[in-house]
Amino acid sequence: MRPIKASISADAMAHNLRVARRHAGAARVFAVVKANAYGHGLSRALRAFGAADGFAVLTLEEAASLRQMGVDKPILLLEGIFDAGEIAACAELDLWPVLHHARQLDWLEQQRPARALEVFLKFDSGMHRLGFPLAEHAEVVARVRALAGVARVTLMTHFAQADDSAGVAWQLQPFREALDGHGLPWSSANSAALMRYPETVGDWVRPGIMLYGASPFTDVPASGLGLEPAMTLRSEIIAVQTLAAGEGIGYGQTFRADKPMRAGVVACGYADGYPRHAPTGTPVVVDGRRTRTLGRVSMDMLCVDLSECPAAGVGSAVVLWGDGLPVDDVAAAAGTSSYELLCALAPRVPIEEVGRNQEAGRGFGNE
């Protein structure tokens, strides 16, 4: 069998949820499990995040899967309903849709659900992505409260720069000033806001990336936040090449040796989810030693520098990210984010669960 695999630790995920809960205080916690739980598998996330107060997903299909798995806790639909036909499913499955544009309100006025829904009413406080304008808050809140198909309302916004130096005040202050007078519960904190800005906690928090052991910040590593990596992508060296000075390796020969050296060929490529654009120098660990990639990443293989790994050879263990090599470090070197790397794990990569919670055994990335 090809040696690449991803090890996923439910124990690490459960630990990271406990970290989130410590920051949340008395607020309730939605575990964000969209995008197949950031590539970790929805069923695995469900077992790991059993202590969450609810789950946040993107689509009706994800929500239905959670209900089929036996989840009876609140499920938040982060983009709400996409057409009037989804209202009935929200009622049947007891889902909490996010309402963020007027057509959704029109649908709820025209088609009363079989049971009144709990909804999250989203306002745009400056990110300019989803949400009603804050200037329209009085009219919008009154309209939603008047809907016979709505049982309870929670106010919501999302931060654009909680993870950088601009912070959240420029969004949080106008959001609170506009909406506090309505006397409704509210939710604003994502992972970055939850860990850095306690004033954003509100009544519900929505941690995502931190639950999977990656840092939401570029200036603080995950270990510095007390987080543990949930996914470790491993493989092995399947060939060793000896390069003379001036010789290149891989497509385009973009790397050329400046002296004689050994290079290892690793069974991992962009078809496995490794970033194709990762340049020479992207960190990798071989037999416990940190080294670097060489040249272009191929579909099924990549090459690594063995200069500092004299004992390495065919069969040597390689960590692409995870235990001993933060996914954030790989993402930074490749000019991307840990979110993208984790979500991009390919279905062809076998997954092995580690830790106490191993009911699913060995499977594949799309399970």
From Swiss-Prot:
It comes from the Bacteria. PROSITE patterns: ALANINE_RACEMASE (PS00395). Substrate binds at R129, M299. It is an enzyme of class 5 (isomerase). Keywords: Isomerase, Pyridoxal phosphate. Gene3D superfamilies: Alanine racemase, Lyase, Ornithine Decarboxylase, Chain A, domain 1. One of its GO terms (cellular component) is cytosol. The modification N6-(pyridoxal phosphate)lysine is found at K34. Its cofactor is pyridoxal 5'-phosphate. Its EC number is 5.1.1.1. The active site is at K34, Y251. Transmembrane segments: none annotated. Pathway: Amino-acid biosynthesis; D-alanine biosynthesis; D-alanine from L-alanine: step 1/1. One of its GO terms (biological process) is D-alanine biosynthetic process. It catalyses: L-alanine = D-alanine. GO terms for molecular function: alanine racemase activity; pyridoxal phosphate binding. SMART domains: Ala_racemase_C. Belongs to the alanine racemase family. Catalyzes the interconversion of L-alanine and D-alanine. May also act on other amino acids. This is Alanine racemase. It comes from Thiobacillus denitrificans (strain ATCC 25259 / T1).
